[in-house]
């Protein structure tokens, strides 16, 4: 058994208590449990914005037999905070104004009107059964529900938003989001050899259902001041328009096959996945327009590496992706995004150590990803290219000292865009 309680006290009146308890329920160890949780009450770097969280995550494992195990999983999370992102105006931050500079922690919203309330819960299980010395079966199932209510004020956003006396024009944003998520993954794994080749074969079928109700309302909020903010303004007269208001049901069925092959120090991974995506949408902000689309795609992946006795493992990988994009525009759902990524890297683990050092460079291209334009509307971008470098170190330096360090550099640009957008 293991039991841990942690208490934190920090800046901005930060107070947090967390616990993690795990152990046997019976003497034979057929039933195991784990129960963790977090309670937090804190301020933030933004004036008048609190950060409160309550989280519980219980789990129960039943070792039904030597070859069979079932783990029940649960989670509940409640967040109650405000608009920490702030959306400060260009004038008074990057640009000088006669009124002066905006302090980094200044709240240009209205704590009497703004809030961020999120409730999330999930239930599921993980089932494992070994059929024989070669085959084993796994099934993972999860249902989750997200409810989000958010009101936030955006300050500025255009060249004339701030007057010489510090008065700032603002926008009022109201978000309502409800997402239910059901996922089940079934797979068989086979470990076997063919001559000098050792195989780990994975064959699976998964299903995902996502129902989304999303609404984003926007209106002109009462003005404030970047130096002496005005709180407690009357928002009852604000007229809102729906930037987004839709109901969307997505169903994704995927069939996948992967083989990891080992020959002496060589490692080769070959895999493929076929997806069938069904999307049905109703856009209430577009005269209740209805849209149904059916998409399918094959995605492949491959990786090759060589494990040296010295602990170095250089590798090269290629992967394709196919992913649904939530929402739509003009009464039509967005196309799924696709991607291709090449990665070249090296891993180093000193013999007899659990310290792992990794360095990698990658080139990623994605098509049909969704972004938000300056008017607040979402729209697809034809193609984005991201190139980057990643360095990472993890492990235990000594028995009492662990290390986690990372560095990431990315360079992204739009390589194909519509006529109405400029390349960056």
Spans of model-derived segments:
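Gram-negative outer-membrane beta-barrel transporters
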Residues: 265, 363, 380-424
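Outer-membrane beta-barrel translocator/receptor signature
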Residues: 1-58, 64-68, 121, 355
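Face-selective signature of the C-terminal outer-membrane beta-barrel domain
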Residues: 123-146, 170-283
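Structural signature of Gram-negative outer-membrane beta-barrels, strongest in the C-terminal barrel
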Residues: 63-65, 179, 198-210, 246-366, ...
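Residues on the lipid-exposed face of transmembrane beta-strands in outer-membrane beta-barrel proteins
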Residues: 19-23, 58-62, 123-129, 184-190, ...
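Acidic/polar loop-and-plug regions of large Gram-negative outer-membrane beta-barrel proteins
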Residues: 40-44, 57-63, 67-130, 148-179, ...
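Outer-envelope beta-barrel architecture signal
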Residues: 3, 15, 29-33, 54, ...
